[in-house]
Amino acid sequence: MVILYKALRYIVITIICLFLAFIGLLAYLFVTQANIEQVNYIEGCKSDETLTVYCDFQNPEDLAVLPDNRHILVSEFGAIIPLSPVNIQGNLSLLDTIDGSKRNLEIEMSENDWGDPKCERENTIFSPHGIDINQRVDGSYQLAIVNHMPTETIELFQLREINDTWSLRWRGCVDAPVHGYFNDVALKSNGSFYVSQMYDKNTSLFMLAVLDNTKEDTGYVYHWTRQNGFERLKNTDGAFPNGVELSEDESNLFINYAFGNKTSKYNLMSESIEATFSMNGIPDNITIDGDYLWVGAQDHSGLDSLIHCGVFANDVFEDPMTNQCPLPFAAYHLKQSDLSLVNSYKYSNTVMGTVTVALSVNGKLFFGTYHGDRIASVELSKE
């Protein structure tokens, strides 16, 4: 009995100590990472003196300009686990940059001749995340999307314009590896692609908060080909790989590490990191602009995102029905050659927040978000 009593006492003390350590860690994370002192919640969907907003979108997380240089293809994001308890259906739509109108894209199903023949799809229910458009060797335009529903896949489409109307023709899919959890994709002209593995899909919300603080490696980048499937790229491991983008000559891959707070230039020939740009915020998606890059970033910490835009938002928001997360954001204009900073644009307490992508089209910079109901734009000549 004495031995049993001591064992039980030891177990109870251990549990109490672990609980106190857990509370202490949460307090430490809050003090060291939560840095937004005041948040002005966004009411309605109206433009202001700086930003023009385009309403009625569902979490327009990633943007890509179409070949006509007029329309923007929008990935209307659903959700990712564990930031959401379950995956949520999203959509693919178009924004007309001339008249500001939105319309959905029609999708026609076809044979799987661009993806993995083993991958099957029976419907057009998607939960899109990162997207990319590129012209294939045969001249056709290909769209790739990271998709989270009903399973984790890369979905491949042919982008078609018929009678001045854009539509999509499904041309295949690729199933993710067993523990695959993707964020963004970058297409090559031969139909292969690069995709960022964020973290193991079984990672808990608490562990994500810890990893955001410790900056430990959580993922890497894959290269997929029809011949060899997924192959992990050497020297791409990092803290939450996020946006990826390929240079026009396909010799360099640009990678954002969200928890690592940096953008890196990866030489595909030497398989090494050649340059890095560091920031205080969270780099998300990357877009190409001639010899330059645009990096959309959240100008706050990961914990701020959880508090104001994540699972705790309903307890923090004055109005739980707030559609647009209001946290500060930034856009960084970088040289492709060495990732040196050309300029940065920072915004707070405006009609947009928590930006994930910055896309330059015809003198305007368009912003998307993973938690909001709008796209915004700014005239670059006025900045």
Label the model's feature ranges.
Residues 51-90, 353-357:
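Beta-strand-rich domains and repeat architectures in extracellular enzymes and scaffolds
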Residues 74-89, 145-146, 195-216, 296-326, ...:
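Short, conserved, GDST-rich strand-edge loop motifs in beta-rich repeat architectures
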Residues 34-59, 114-117, 167-168, 339-347:
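A short helix->beta-strand "capping" segment at the edge of beta-propeller domains
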Residues 56, 66, 72-78, 142-149, ...:
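Conserved beta-strand positions in repeat-built beta-propeller and related beta-rich domains
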Residues 96-100, 159-163, 224-228, 267-271, ...:
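Short loop/turn segments that connect beta-strands within beta-propeller blades
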Residues 78-81, 85-137, 285:
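Blade-loop segments of beta-propeller domains
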Residues 57-67, 111-135, 170, 175-193, ...:
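Beta-rich, blade/repeat-based domains predominating
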Residues 22-49, 97, 164, 214-215, ...:
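Blade/loop signatures of beta-propeller domains
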